[in-house]
Design a protein with these regions (language model features):
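One-carbon transfer enzymes
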Residues: 1-251
Length: 251
């Protein structure tokens, strides 16, 4: 039986480990990974390069979406570009995305921050079928977990990363063998709610107004203080005054 072809689109540690899992199980899953698209974002871990991993296993590097060949499957994990209808249709069987947030509650970007700002008690991660709208396609599999009290954004990221890798490893074999059911997100919108956020919104929620009450200030700091990124700040005159974790420890 001929192997099914897979195009992998991804970045960040979760993308690296999902790609590596597929590489290690190519024979068991009866697949061939025929190409990788990645911006090789190593912000979270400089040792995890998807492009280097692909080269080590003779996987072709593809520079742009319009250069993708047809494949049986497209698997997207934290890919940095939005796929258009014509891109998704390059998958003859199925195009899927691993979205590190619960759906339909949090589509788009900065989902960890907004969940903390919204005071959510539960978070999650989702594998869904891709369509032309952002994080909108039918749900294939999901995993949910409680958000700890006074959770910081990096803690929620770590919890979601672990849940996402487990979700992928537990479900990808069935997905590749067409053993799954689809659930439309619309069926959950009344119960769960829905929102979409964009990458540039993080700049607005990092700006702290010192006239806010203490709880709101603390919540914004917990939601936006991520090691390796610009910290939350307040403007005093024309100067940015940055907050740090020591503020939380001394309060």
């Amino acid at each position: 039986m001929s192997k099914q072809s897979v195009l992998f689109l991804g970045s960040k540690p979760i993308g690296y480990h999902c790609l590596n899992y597929l590489i290690q199980h190519q024979d068991a899953f009866n697949i061939e990974i025929i190409g990788l698209l990645s911006n090789d974002n190593t912000t979270f871990d400089s040792t995890l390069s998807l492009k280097k991993l692909a080269k080590e296993h003779n996987i072709i590097l593809i520079d742009a979406l319009n250069e993708m060949p047809e494949s049986d499957f497209i698997i997207s994990v934290q890919y940095h570009e939005i796929l258009k209808k014509q891109d998704i249709e390059k998958a003859k069987i199925l195009a899927i995305n691993l979205h590190m947030a619960p759906l339909p509650e949090y589509r788009g970007c900065n989902q960890f921050s907004f969940a903390i700002l919204d005071g959510k008690k539960e978070f999650g991660t989702t594998i869904h079928k891709m369509d032309a709208r952002i994080d909108h396609g039918d749900i294939i599999a999901e995993k949910r977990f409680p958000i700890p009290t006074n959770c910081w954004v990096n803690e929620l990221y770590d919890l979601t990363y672990s849940a996402s890798l487990s979700l992928f490893q537990e479900n990808i074999a069935n997905i590749l063998s067409n053993q799954f059911t689809l659930q439309t997100q619309k069926d959950f919108e009344n119960e769960r709610g829905t929102s979409i956020h964009f990458r540039n919104e993080i700049h607005d929620i990092k700006r702290i107004d010192l006239s806010w009450d203490k709880e709101k200030i603390e919540r914004h700091i917990r939601a936006t203080y991520m090691p390796g990124f610009e910290p939350p700040y307040a403007m005093i005159g024309n100067e940015k005054i940055y907050f740090s974790t020591t503020w939380n420890e001394k309060k």
